[in-house]
């Protein structure tokens, strides 16, 4: 993205990776650079410009593909593994902004994705509060703010939290789960 506002900024890179339920990556994924709209690169803020310069992405803008072509390729890639609409969640780290950009600029892709998201940053924040030992030992990230590297690091991070924070096995029995649910009362205001 050239910034965080989908009304004035644009997508400049998109990637996707499909995993199975155990977070095993099924193939190398897809990673595309999108040619920015005229004027958006010049209008980028200093922070974003430095980030895209340091990562090398800014040097790839001119050879990027059209936004519609990028949407079609990503959608084709996802449908190869998940042909049914509304079943594939968007997943990654701090993906609220990603979802807004996809909704605005890639409506067919947005329509194919499930409305629910899997945001690793939520798990990270809960772990920081409830399981700080696990949080502070989490794998360090160094994706350099490139889409595919960020996705792969998010998958590794989610694998880590799954093993270090979430209950191993199938979880509580139905009876235990029901007893837990019955024991939790929300304070009334």
Regions found by a protein language model. Name each.
Residues 35-40, 47-48, 120-152:
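Active-site-proximal helix-loop-helix substrate-binding element of RNase H-like nuclease domains
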Residues 80-82, 97-116:
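Substrate-recognition/cap helix-loop segment adjacent to the acidic, metal-dependent catalytic center
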Residues 91-96:
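Short, well-ordered beta-to-alpha junction loops that form the rim of enzyme active sites
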Residues 21, 103, 125-130, 174-177, ...:
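Catalytic phosphate/metal-binding cores of nucleic-acid and nucleotide-processing enzymes, i.e., regions
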Residues 141, 145-189:
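Acidic two-metal-ion nuclease catalytic site recognized across multiple nuclease folds
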Residues 1-90, 139, 187-189:
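Conserved non-catalytic scaffold segment of RNase H-like nuclease domains
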Residues 110-114, 134-138, 166-171:
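Short conserved catalytic/interaction loops centered on acidic-Pro-aromatic/His motifs
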Residues 13, 20, 98, 119, ...:
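Acidic active-site catalytic centers that drive phospho-/nucleotidyl reactions
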